[in-house]
């Protein structure tokens, strides 16, 4: 069965899907001829020298929605369960979109401990900027700047000084055109604050979100990243929750990296296997899309640290095209992504 999934990278993803029959996972835990041992729950990344993600291990959540879906389907829909296992066995980022006070700190700290105990590298997304998503499908965020700073402080306290990857505020810079001049200045200040606060941890690997290759001109995005404090971060993230091809993302990222003094970037490849849709609202639950390349540091650019699954495949983009509210699990959409994957 391994021949059906000829992965090019050497990212090793093992899984602790204890509730799932191993025969449904076998096709996806054999990577490049290297058999992984069920129970490890992590995956190893190998990459270029100087890359902070090289040699890291990525966490696979044994209780993810995809894992639960595999368990639910394995008796009655075995072929679909096998397809869903592609998602269940692949590392994905963990998102924090709100919360406050001791409960939030405990949530972050508990997850961080669990991942570290698995000898893995936490990959987190912070998505709580005030006026998030300009009030559209993923609208919300902190009530004001004071609340946001407190939230960032709580997160920073919870992760401590351990090594962690943080993707900071998807769409916040690319999408700030909906704000007034004062609102834009406030947003720049808040993201800059987040960068400064998180950078106190010298082991934090920070990437500011830079939209996608089909959104803003490179020169515009470079200016926005600089105002937001990218010089204190590792670099920027591209294509988060979007569908632009890896090739287009790398080309855009290379140009942007050079403008910023040869900084580095990561690309979200979770759902870009067939590129963007050509219809309206192409970014919101487009039909007939596919999973993209699995996480790896074997990229096609010396500036690109990794391809990662930052968006969780199968979570809705919003109430468009028949989808549930943003962030809710949509199993049939997830299944379609897996079925159309090239691997």
Locate the predicted segments by residue:
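Structural preference for beta-strand elements that scaffold enzyme active sites
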Residues: 121-123, 163-167, 203-207, 233-237, ...
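Bacterial N-terminal signal peptides
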Residues: 27-39
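N-terminal carbohydrate-binding/catalytic regions of secreted carbohydrate-active enzymes
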Residues: 53-154, 158, 312, 316, ...
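Surface-exposed substrate-engagement region within the catalytic domains
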Residues: 55, 60-88, 213-335
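N-terminal secretory signal peptides that target proteins for export/translocation
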Residues: 1-22
């Amino acid at each position: 069965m391994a021949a059906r999934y000829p992965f090019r990278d050497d990212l090793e993803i093992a899984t602790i899907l204890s509730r799932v029959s191993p025969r449904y996972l076998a096709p996806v835990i054999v990577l490049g001829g290297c058999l992984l041992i069920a129970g490890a729950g992590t995956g190893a990344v190998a990459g270029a020298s100087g890359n902070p993600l090289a040699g890291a291990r990525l966490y696979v959540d044994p209780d993810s929605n995809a894992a639960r879906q595999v368990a639910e389907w394995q008796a009655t829909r075995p072929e679909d369960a096998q397809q869903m296992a592609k998602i269940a066995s692949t590392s994905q980022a963990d998102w924090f979109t709100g919360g406050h006070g001791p409960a939030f700190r405990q949530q972050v700290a508990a997850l961080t401990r669990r991942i570290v105990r698995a000898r893995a590298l936490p990959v987190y997304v912070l998505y709580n900027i005030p006026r998030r998503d300009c009030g559209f499908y993923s609208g919300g965020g902190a009530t004001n700047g004071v609340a946001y700073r407190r939230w960032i402080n709580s997160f920073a306290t919870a992760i401590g000084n351990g090594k962690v990857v943080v993707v900071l505020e998807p769409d916040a810079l690319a999408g700030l055109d909906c704000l007034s001049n004062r609102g834009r200045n406030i947003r720049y200040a808040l993201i800059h604050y987040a960068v400064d606060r998180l950078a106190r941890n010298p082991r934090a690997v920070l990437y500011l979100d830079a939209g996608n290759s089909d959104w803003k001109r490179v020169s515009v995005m470079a200016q926005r990243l600089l105002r937001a404090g990218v010089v204190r971060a590792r670099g920027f993230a591209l294509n988060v929750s979007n569908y632009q091809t890896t090739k287009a993302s790398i080309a855009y990222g290379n140009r942007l990296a050079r403008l910023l003094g040869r900084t580095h970037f990561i690309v979200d490849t979770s759902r870009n296997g067939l590129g963007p849709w050509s219809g309206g609202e192409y970014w919101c639950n487009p039909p007939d899309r596919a999973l993209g390349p699995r996480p790896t540091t074997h990229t096609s650019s010396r500036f690109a640290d990794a391809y990662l699954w930052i968006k969780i495949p199968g979570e809705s983009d919003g109430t468009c095209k028949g989808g549930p509210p943003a962030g809710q699990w949509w199993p049939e959409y997830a299944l379609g992504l897996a079925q159309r994957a090239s691997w």
